């Protein structure tokens, strides 16, 4: 079973939980270039391709990094412009943010951008109409709907496998690929395959659950470049955010290497090329 390997190309200070004002970003040390290059070298080592959801701000600051991702044969998607939460934006603000990121990425890559992932999975129930906007502007694959609730985002009860959304009675051709979870009940799903959850759980649990998932559907692993850099700056914040942001950063690289050696991975477009998907009213 081919699983999707995805990277959210953003810097440590873009994280919504840290809540660092955008006006301060330029005064902070960036780690996105060396960390992303490290991931690219790692993927070359294991001969695997991935989908890189690139934040417009990161692309604007490091256009050569985006070119290098393309040069090495990986798939490019948009992660928005400035890592603003979708549910905190009006439709006009969202469209402006989204189109700005698309313009930058298409100018750098010379390619049409067909994939999108919202910052922090932040498309909420009252913002589902942005999926129609994405489709109208050329997006074929979206990965923004998190099938479990957190204080920051998420939608309980939505499909856990790739699906075609039905929004306000309209069947979309866009395919939604949610982050991989193990569904325990209709209203409870167990995340394990990316970000903090990948760092939190022992590798044995991650591997066991992904194997179970692969009996019925493809999984998706997601990672941020800063997660393989245990030396990122420590921002002063409350204990919970500090725990989520910095817990077991030193474990990420080894876990990722084990996953790449044990499972088959590819970019989202390749994974979904032959995947049958269902319609689902969300």
Language model: regions and residue ranges:
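Generic structural signal for well-ordered alpha-helices
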Residues: 36-40, 63-67, 95-103, 131, ...
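Conserved, mostly hydrophobic/aromatic
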Residues: 8, 43, 52, 79, ...
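C-terminal domain-boundary segment and adjacent tail
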Residues: 45-46, 200-282
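Active-site beta->alpha N-cap acidic-glycine motif
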Residues: 1-72
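Active-site-adjacent pocket scaffolds in enzyme catalytic domains
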Residues: 107, 111-114, 118-217
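Metal-dependent polysaccharide deacetylase catalytic core of the NodB/CE4 family, i.e.
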Residues: 46-127, 139-140, 144-151, 172-173, ...
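Alpha-helix N-cap and loop-to-helix initiation/capping positions
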Residues: 23-31, 89-96, 240-251
